[in-house]
A protein has these predicted regions:
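Periplasmic/cell-envelope proteins involved in peptidoglycan metabolism and beta-lactam response
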Residues: 1-297, 307, 319, 341, ...
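Beta-lactam-recognizing serine transpeptidase/beta-lactamase-like catalytic domain environment
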Residues: 3-6, 223-233, 265, 273-325, ...
Length: 643
């Protein structure tokens, strides 16, 4: 039965009104919501939109450069290109890296390192995928930006050491920030969290890290949906690090390093009047640029396994028995104590009986009647055994400390070895045993427990030469370190110092002096010096049975160290030099010629004339000078050296 038309019409109208009301209500709610979104929360969504399209990138500062005393560049920055990845901008990191690998050359190691860095860092921080890429690679990446989301080519600065291995043990090198580097700092600089950001890892690069690094800048950049940089919205420039100027003379440093050759050795050159270090060498060395670029496991293991220890800065880290170079200290202690004077003599039959045992002189037949001058000139051991037992270890140790032994010297090299000046208290504390008179006899001739670095030997020599408390300085006039010379005296009787200096002159200039064969002929530059041989191992009975009777018969590691210290000119000391050749044998045959050559190079400020050398040496020296002229870099003041 059908419903009458009027009733049907009314029912439809009610439904229409209901639907219309619902639609109007929904539209009203929507309008209110739209108003809330568009007006009330407009600023918030505008900020969110900006955050989605604006990235903040830190601007690395230019690292301060390092120069020698004449303005020759030792560490500088070179422009380089790298490819970075921001994880949150890449939809599929593996896919993006695979695509990148199709376009440019990236190694499996690069990819592996990238994933390691991504795990360690926030997703919004850029991670370096490939460093030191070519300009062609940069262009290819830029052109393919739409298919490489999160990938950005960047320009940066890389550290370069123009003089390579010549300055490794002074300047050091930089390398990527490690977890350990961050842990050592309470509030790390944000720069240090940039993946593969490089900081000083050794020597001056590390000691002056805060001085050299500078301060970060920042830039706000706008990117499109594909991650391509559209424009730079804002920029705050970085502040470059401060430069560092050294007292080292690059020409002399290169010569000294070359003169050491393949020896495991060190040489230190000091200005006697100011304490400025003119050369600070250690051999063998290595190329620091390899560490900046990423040294291979093979190359690094080769350095670790080299028995000559190229990673050790021997000039400051080495600690060696002084050998006979310590005899000047023993002599001064006896003079100051009034035990001897210049005319005192001791008879040397070739040995001295101490506590029921014979202590031998190096000259088994003996030196006969020995004065102070003769004792140093011919390096008689018995003379020093005798006077040391009378003066005692405490007085000897006191004088040794006045000449810079047993302490570190502030030259901003954190690896410096303080050496050792033993005493009765030291032996009780360290070995829980009493001091014996045999210990005193050993120390008197620079054997036993007394140890020094080549730097300390140079300091002693400069103080002996001048009578002043000269302290070493490696940093020239900068805000980083004050460079005033020490003028205080060593508080010893000037007559005693004069007597020791005169004996050192005889060592190098008297026919029976131990360094006579390495003398300087030029009257204006006559040197005073002292040879030393420090025993590493005594020849055992087992070795003697095998026919080992001399140093040369032994394995290299068991041979004695060779030492020589000197200063010149004798009448007006300007330069002090110390040389230590590990396992080099006698100081007179190995260390003295090297020290003499370096000393003359410093005094002449370049290649000395052949007439400065003994006639017997001139042919060898001429050949050596020609060879060095070919291999040494030619350096001029203010020059940027190309490798």
């Amino acid at each position: 039965m059908s419903m009458p038309a009027p009733k049907l019409s009314k029912k439809m109208m009610r439904r229409a009104f209901l639907v219309g009301g619902l639609q109007l209500g929904f539209a009203g709610v929507l309008a209110v919501r739209m108003r809330h979104l568009q007006i009330d929360q407009a600023d918030q969504f505008r900020l969110m939109a900006d955050e989605n399209r604006i990235n903040v990138r830190l601007i690395s500062p230019k690292r301060g450069e390092i120069y020698d005393r004449n303005g020759i560049t030792l560490a500088r920055n070179e422009q380089s290109f790298r490819i970075t990845l921001v994880e949150e901008e890449a939809d599929d990191v593996k896919g993006v890296l695979d695509k990148l690998g199709e376009l440019i050359t990236i190694t499996p190691e690069d990819v592996e390192q990238t994933f390691i860095e991504l795990k360690k860092n926030a997703p919004f921080l850029p991670v370096t995928v490939a460093d030191r890429v070519s300009w062609d690679d940069v262009s290819i990446v830029a052109l393919n930006a739409p298919v490489l989301p999160g990938i950005t080519p960047e320009t940066g600065l890389s550290r370069q050491y123009p003089l390579g291995s010549y300055f490794t043990h002074v300047v050091g090198y930089v390398g990527p920030v490690s977890t350990r580097d961050l842990e050592k700092r309470d509030a790390p600089d944000p720069l240090l969290k940039i993946p593969r950001f490089q900081i000083g890892k050794s020597r001056l690069e590390a000691s002056f890290e805060d001085h050299l690094r500078g301060k970060a800048g920042a830039r706000n950049i706008e990117v499109n949906a594909a991650g391509r940089v559209m424009q730079e919205l804002d920029r705050r420039e970085s502040e470059a690090g401060a430069n560092l100027k050294l007292t080292i003379d690059a020409n002399l440093q290169c010569y000294a390093q070359a003169r050491l050759g393949e020896e495991s050795a060190s040489a230190v050159v000091m200005d006697c009047k100011t304490g400025e270090l003119l050369a600070l060498t250690s051999s063998p060395s290595y190329d620091p640029n390899k560490f900046v670029r990423g040294i291979s496991h093979k190359d690094y293991n080769a350095l670790l396994e080299d028995k000559r220890k190229p990673l050790v800065s021997k000039s400051v880290q080495g600690a060696y028995p002084h050998g006979s170079t310590f005899k000047m200290i023993t002599a001064l202690a006896a003079l100051e104590a009034g035990i001897i004077d210049e005319k005192t003599t001791v008879y040397c039959p070739g040995h001295l009986e101490i506590a029921g045992k014979k202590k031998y002189c190096w000259k088994r037949g003996g030196h006969g009647k020995v004065s102070l001058e003769k004792s140093l000139r011919e390096s008689c051991d018995v003379f020093y055994y005798d006077i040391a037992l009378k003066v005692g270890i405490e007085k000897i140790a006191e004088v040794a400390r006045r000449f810079g032994f047993g302490e570190k010297h502030d030259i901003s090299m954190s690896v410096e070895n303080e050496g050792l000046v033993p005493s009765k208290e030291w032996k009780r504390r360290m070995r829980d045993s009493d001091w014996l008179i045999g210990d005193t006899a050993n120390v008197a001739i620079g054997q036993g427990d007394v140890l020094a670095s080549p730097l300390q030997l140079a300091i002693m020599t400069a103080r002996l030469a001048t009578g002043k408390m000269i302290s070493p300085k490696l940093i020239a006039d900068t805000n980083a370190q004050k460079n005033d010379a020490e003028e205080a005296g060593v508080t010893l009787n000037p007559a005693h110092l004069k007597a020791v200096r005169k004996a050192m002159y005889e060592v190098s200039n008297a026919r029976n002096g131990t360094a006579y064969r390495s003398r300087v002929i030029d009257e204006a530059f006559r040197m005073a010096g002292k040879t030393g041989t420090s025993q590493v191992f005594t020849i055992s009975e087992a070795e003697r049975k095998k026919g080992v009777t001399s140093n040369e018969d032994r394995d290299w590691e068991r041979r004695d160290h060779a030492l020589f210290v000197c200063f010149a000119p004798y009448d007006d000391p300007k330069i002090a030099v110390s040389v230590v050749v590990e396992h080099g044998g006698g100081g007179s045959t190995t260390a003295a010629p090297i020290a003499r050559d370096i000393l003359l190079q410093a005094l002449y400020n370049g290649t000395p004339p052949l007439t400065a050398y003994p006639v017997k040496d001139r042919a060898t020296i001429s050949k050596q000078q020609t060879q060095f002229k070919e291999i040494l870099p030619r350096l001029k003041s203010g020059e940027n050296v190309e490798t």
